[in-house]
């Protein structure tokens, strides 16, 4: 069998831009919306995008999505164990 091919999932047209927030950004986000980490939507540590970013449980991922009506909007998820 041939060797395993590797590619960046972020190069695919359907995968929006992802990034891990710094601790300061995470704290500011939680304060801005007056929420806790438990109130954020979750994303599993086994998600291919999370693996590609090297994020670990407790990290917050910012997802930049494009919308035909809203232009660009940001979505936040907290990384959890599988």
Curated annotation (Swiss-Prot):
State the Pfam families in the record: RNA_pol_Rpb5_C
Q: Spell out the Gene3D superfamilies in the cross-references.
A: RPB5-like RNA polymerase subunit
**What does it catalyze?**
RNA(n) + a ribonucleoside 5'-triphosphate = RNA(n+1) + diphosphate
- Where is the protein localized? Cytoplasm
GO MF annotations, alphabetized: DNA binding; DNA-directed RNA polymerase activity
> EC?
2.7.7.6
UniProt keyword annotations, A-Z: Cytoplasm, DNA-directed RNA polymerase, Nucleotidyltransferase, Transcription, Transferase
Nucleotidyltransferase: present as a keyword of the record? yes
Query: Hey, what's the signal peptide range on this chain?
Result: none
Q: Which GO terms of type biological process are on file?
A: transcription by RNA polymerase II; transcription elongation by RNA polymerase I; tRNA transcription by RNA polymerase III
The terms describing its cellular component in GO are: cytoplasm; DNA-directed RNA polymerase complex
Q: Which SUPFAM superfamilies match?
A: RPB5-like RNA polymerase subunit (SSF55287)
Which EC class does it fall in?
Answer: transferase
Q: Does the keyword Cytoplasm apply?
A: yes
Instruction: State its role.
Output: DNA-dependent RNA polymerase (RNAP) catalyzes the transcription of DNA into RNA using the four ribonucleoside triphosphates as substrates.
Q: How does it assemble?
A: Part of the RNA polymerase complex.
The family line of this record is: Belongs to the archaeal Rpo5/eukaryotic RPB5 RNA polymerase subunit family.
Which HAMAP family does the UniProt entry name for this protein? RNApol_Rpo5_RPB5
NCBIfam families, alphabetized:
PRK09570.1
- The name this protein goes by in its record: DNA-directed RNA polymerase subunit Rpo5
């Amino acid at each position: 069998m041939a060797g395993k091919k590797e590619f960046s999932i972020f190069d695919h047209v359907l995968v929006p831009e992802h990034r891990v927030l710094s601790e300061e950004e995470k704290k500011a986000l939680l304060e801005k919306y007056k929420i806790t980490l438990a109130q954020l939507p979750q994303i599993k540590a086994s998600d291919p995008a999370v693996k590609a970013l090297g994020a670990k449980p407790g990290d917050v991922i910012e997802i930049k999505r494009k919308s035909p009506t809203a232009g660009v909007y940001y979505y936040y998820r907290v990384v959890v164990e599988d």
